[in-house]
Amino acid sequence: MPWIQLKLNTTGNQAESLGDVLVESGAVSVTFQDTHDNPVFEPLPGETRLWGDTDVIGLYDAETDMADVVAMLECHPQIGKGFIHKIEQLEDKDWEREWMDNFHPMRFGERLWICPSWRDVPDPTAVNVMLDPGLAFGTGTHPTTALCLQWLDSLDLNGKTLIDFGCGSGILAIAALKLGAARAIGIDIDPQAIQASRDNAQRNGVSERLELYLAKDQPAELSADVVVANILAGPLRELALLISVLPTTGGHLGLSGVLATQAAGVAQAYEDKFILDPVAEKEEWCRITGIKK
């Protein structure tokens, strides 16, 4: 069925309360979008962060009398008469099919493919990780995930142990296992990430070789031949002492979730314990790798 979209602009501080007003006016869903198309980086646990200049978008049934909606909004103290807004009719589409059509198998390095379950595998002889895109966790589309997957593909992981620190969907740990790692350990602060990793590991037939822990429950004295942490620059700096002890001597470290402009600050936190490689960049993001001294 077709829909009607109402868009209005506000500040990040007022966006959520304005979204509630749109729901009260009959919107069946409300979304927030940056007016200037800037990214919002991952918030701290329990924190909701929006842009300073935010578009609030309400979706209404096509039968809705939008004149009545506008009149109601004009009477609301947070909005008032003459508020600037845009109303448009949305084309009726099979949104689920259109969404699925946007995702295709992706190749990382020489051997590794990430494939949605509804697509044919391009190369049955390659290393294929079956992973469907979701809302919260990595699927290879983000440059930082791509950088980490390319790095894992370049390593000899046969018989090795890997720690995925901040595992999210489990994509990096699962890819490592399918690339030959004997064992992988996924750690995350989010219980939903642990469940997503568990489900994805089962779908890929590697669940028996993947151990998963909430960060607060991770065993003491963990170590691995390879450690990858695709999180954010701030946590990578703050947790440098914890992460640095995880690789064995001569082991590999891979860090991402870092903007190219943040690379020097993150590298500085690890350079005492690692021989660092040149920074790899993709778009505005980068990857820092090295060998444990």
Curated annotation (Swiss-Prot):
Localization per Swiss-Prot or TrEMBL: Cytoplasm
Gene Ontology molecular-function annotations: protein-lysine N-methyltransferase activity
A GO term from the CC aspect: cytosol
UniProt binding sites for S-adenosyl-L-methionine: T145, G166, D188, N230
Matches recorded under InterPro entries: Ribosomal_L11_MeTrfase_PrmA (IPR050078), Ribosomal_PrmA_MeTrfase (IPR004498), SAM-dependent_MTases_sf (IPR029063)
SUPFAM superfamilies linked: S-adenosyl-L-methionine-dependent methyltransferases (SSF53335)
Pfam families: PrmA (PF06325)
S-S bonds: none
The enzyme's E.C. designation: 2.1.1.-
UniProt keywords, alphabetically: Cytoplasm, Methyltransferase, S-adenosyl-L-methionine, Transferase
Gene3D superfamilies in the cross-refs: Vaccinia Virus protein VP39
Assigned protein family: Belongs to the methyltransferase superfamily. PrmA family.
Function field: Methylates ribosomal protein L11.
Protein name from the UniProt record: Ribosomal protein L11 methyltransferase
Species, as recorded: Yersinia pseudotuberculosis serotype IB (strain PB1/+)
Taxonomic lineage from the root: Bacteria, Pseudomonadati, Pseudomonadota, Gammaproteobacteria, Enterobacterales
UniProt gene name: prmA
